[in-house]
């Protein structure tokens, strides 16, 4: 109901804090697909604050990382989560995909993570 009352006003930007917190996978997916549709059909920019790194990888094309009041980077989620110079000071956990890429000797771990996510998006 709350988001519907906001959408009536046709905002240019929606700022959402943990929009999928506490949701099961089905509801999580419904919420995110709904937000994706709003973005694509109405051109609404959606800014999400999240601690769910998989959600960030799956549904966003840009990540802004702030730690201790400082902007650390603006980049793709895959690059953010595979760059130890960003993850460490931002207290972010690198993904298991990154760890697998490192253990398998894949040089471009960022590209590996991005390709996996692209595949996952395609089959969803």
Task: Give residue ranges: language-model regions.
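A short, proline-enriched helix->beta-strand linker immediately N-terminal to the Walker B motif
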Residues: 8-12
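H-loop/switch region of ABC-family ATPase nucleotide-binding domains
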Residues: 50-51
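A short, surface-exposed alpha-helical micro-motif characterized by mixed small hydrophobic
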Residues: 56-58
